[in-house]
Regions:
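Residues at the starts of beta-strands that form the adenosine-phosphate
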Residues: 3, 27-28, 114, 141, ...
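Glycine-rich, N-terminal phosphate-binding loop of Rossmann-like dinucleotide-binding domains
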Residues: 68-70, 95, 146
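NAD(P)+-binding Rossmann beta1-loop-alpha1 motif at the extreme N-terminus of oxidoreductases
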Residues: 1-60
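Internal alpha-helical scaffold of NAD(P)-dependent oxidoreductase catalytic cores
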Residues: 134-220
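Rossmann-like NAD(P)-binding element
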Residues: 56-85, 89-90
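Interdomain hinge/lid region at the active-site interface
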Residues: 207-275
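Rossmann-like NAD(P)(H) cofactor-binding subdomain of soluble oxidoreductases
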Residues: 77-130
Length: 298
């Protein structure tokens, strides 16, 4: 690869930029960013890239295009770049929900052009190019989506690319991806948002300074609840069916805990608590533990 175009230079886009430069993967990196404030930050930070405003001259000369925007931005951008795309160009994204976005891409992308979707399991509650870090993807999973019409050559090239920046690569189809991450990432984020809302509602109801005394649990959940609201709205809406199913399962288990507490069912609640500890041990054994809780960043 000689040239890469990153569309969207927030946390993920700027971290990719830094990582690509660190690993010396390509000669030139182009950035397309619609936010004027982000463009100012990119220039102030002196990030090693060329910020572009026009796709026409650039797209035919890039080897890889990476969408690092919210899911709701995909359609507009595809329509802008479609006529300049070449079959040789590898196109990917870093979105956290796949089935609906892949359906949209199939409808809007011109014939003969291939899109191979990626999902690096990395992130932070902060956003913007000033928060990007070069080692964000190091030793983190990156899921590549393989469908019936996936271009195998592009898939291999993307796998090689993500491994070069330090990611561990796994391959699955979009349906399995959305099912898995509805539970491991999307539900934990939804719980975080709702826990913080519950805490603020409870504080108003009791008229206590509750937030002031946040313990580790609420503090860590509040960090996740500070994540970008547009990005997470898009994820919730795009993975609506799977998320709704895991919400129902969560409510069922929450009510079961409530019943055990109200009836002081010692045997049942101890069994539940022990079983959840086993999952924690498994996470540590699989080396999925980190110093700073991130509740399945995506």
């Amino acid at each position: 690869m000689k040239n890469i175009l990153i569309i969207g230079c927030g946390l993920i886009g700027s971290s990719l930029l830094r990582s690509i430069v660190e690993k010396k993967i390509v000669k030139k990196i182009f950035i397309y960013e619609k936010s004027k404030s982000n463009i100012i930050k990119i220039k102030k930070l002196k990030l090693p890239c060329e910020v572009i405003s026009d796709f026409k001259k650039i797209i035919p000369n890039v080897d890889l295009i990476i969408f690092c925007t919210p899911l709701s931005e995909y359609e507009k951008i595809i329509l802008k770049i479609n006529k300049y795309l070449l079959p040789k160009t590898i196109i990917t994204d870093v979105g956290s929900s796949k089935e609906k976005s892949m359906e949209l891409i199939k409808k809007k992308l011109k014939k003969g052009i291939f899109w191979t979707s990626s999902h690096p399991i990395a992130g932070s509650e902060v956003s913007g190019p000033e928060h990007g870090v070069k080692n964000l993807f190091h030793n983190k999973w990156c899921i590549l989506i393989k469908e019936r019409n996936t271009n195998e050559k592009h898939l291999r090239a993307l796998s090689k690319f993500w491994k070069k920046i330090g990611s561990r690569v796994a391959i699955m189809d979009s349906k399995k991806h959305d099912t898995v991450f509805s539970m491991t990432s999307h539900l934990p984020h939804l719980i975080a948002y709702n826990l913080v809302k519950t805490a603020t509602d409870f504080e108003k109801q009791k008229n206590y300074e509750l937030i002031k005394f946040s313990a580790g649990g609420l503090r860590d959940f509040s960090r996740i609840a500070a994540s970008n609201e547009i990005m997470w709205r898009d994820i919730f809406f795009n993975n609506q069916k799977n998320i709704s199913e895991v919400i129902d399962l969560f409510i069922k288990n929450l009510l079961s805990f409530k019943k055990d507490i109200q009836s002081k069912n010692n045997k049942s609640i101890i069994k539940k608590l022990i079983n959840t500890k086993k999952v924690r041990k498994k996470i540590i054994k699989l080396k999925q533990d980190i110093n700073k809780p991130d509740f399945g960043r995506s």
